[in-house]
Design a protein with these regions (language model features):
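Secondary-structure end/capping motifs
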Residues: 195-265
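A local structural motif
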Residues: 29-42, 124-137, 272-278
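Pocket-lining segment of extracytoplasmic ligand-binding domains
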Residues: 136-225
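Extracytoplasmic small-molecule ligand-binding "clamshell" domains
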Residues: 16-20, 30-64
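A bilobed periplasmic-binding-protein/Venus flytrap-type ligand-binding module shared by bacterial periplasmic
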Residues: 23-24, 89-99, 183-198
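Bilobed "Venus flytrap"/periplasmic-binding protein-like clamshell domains
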Residues: 3-28, 90-148, 155, 257, ...
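A structural signal for short loop-to-beta-strand junctions that line the ligand-binding cleft
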Residues: 7-8, 74-82, 107
Length: 284
């Protein structure tokens, strides 16, 4: 904990995270039963939050599902706050229409190495030369003809057409066709070193914040649109609702099964050394 009574809470400055943290940010939901903890929100891109989690810096934080095997010793997954694609997810886009096998040996822009999109790319793409770029810079070199394709996350899933690019495939659709499960992309987790009652209070606060966002949809969406990175209101709301759904409030058995399958496949493909136990904190 970062000081007496202060909790550090990390999430990304994205429309979906802003929507689910709306009530916490605006002090509509407190942490704890009666005695409210002070909290300090840390807003950083997901790659930076992943790196902070690897150093166990924050009390509660958003992470990529792909990084959990590396932080499982320090963090426990919360049953709420997950970003799960329901038959959709990161996109592979190119300047000219083509098929996935056509990318073999080509240079492909990808977001950070700890992102779930990168893990999925290693599962489903042919062998390519990965070019690591910040997630919001992957499309430009493809549009300019410098790279063959890009793996696109966040708002780019809705704006790639504006850049004159073509969708080769939706990795979330490929995942669903093979597994029949939702695609776990992002998680919220809490430090194992915190007292068990405090971990449950943080879980309750985040679930309460998500519940309040659904109940105060217009205000929560207006707030979330401030983090839409230049996209219009209609697409900003669409993006937020893509990744804040029923499984965000409670991932349930389907979410746990999806995480287990993701790590099983990653271990089988030798992307990670071994599949970690999927340790999820539920209420009660």
């Amino acid at each position: 904990m970062a000081g007496i009574g202060e909790l550090t809470i990390g999430h990304s400055p994205d429309a979906d995270d802003a929507f689910m943290f709306y009530a916490i940010t605006h002090d509509l939901v407190g942490i704890g039963d009666g005695a409210r903890y002070r909290h300090r929100e840390v807003l950083e891109d997901i790659q930076s939050l992943n790196e902070r989690a690897l150093r166990a810096e924050l009390d509660m934080t958003a992470i990529s599902a792909a990084v959990y095997p590396d932080v499982a010793a320090d963090y426990q997954i919360l049953c709420c706050g997950a970003s799960m694609g329901l038959g959709y997810g990161p996109l592979v886009v190119s300047r000219e229409p083509c098929a996935l096998p056509d990318l073999a040996g080509k240079r492909v822009a990808m977001p950070g190495p700890h992102t779930t999109a990168f893990m999925l790319s290693k599962m489903f793409l042919p062998p390519v030369e990965a070019v690591q770029l910040p997630f919001d810079q992957v499309m430009e070199p493809v549009a300019d003809g410098e790279l063959a394709a890009a793996v696109v996350i966040h708002e780019g899933q809705l704006t790639y057409v504006d850049a004159g690019l073509y969708k080769i495939c939706d990795l979330g659709q490929v995942w669903f066709e093979e597994t029949g499960l939702p695609l776990p992309l992002g998680l919220d987790c809490v430090k194992r070193s915190l007292p068990s009652d405090l971990r449950l209070q943080l879980l309750d606060a985040l679930q309460g914040s998500i519940r309040a966002a659904f109940a105060n949809n217009a205000a929560a969406v207006d707030y979330a649109l401030q983090f839409g990175r230049g996209i219009d209101a209609e697409r900003g709301e669409k993006f937020a609702k893509m990744y804040v759904n029923d499984l965000t409030y409670d991932m349930g058995d389907d979410g746990v099964a999806a995480l287990a399958e993701l790590y099983r496949r990653a271990a089988a493909a030798e992307i990670i050394p071994a599949a970690p136990p999927v340790d999820v904190l539920f209420p009660g």
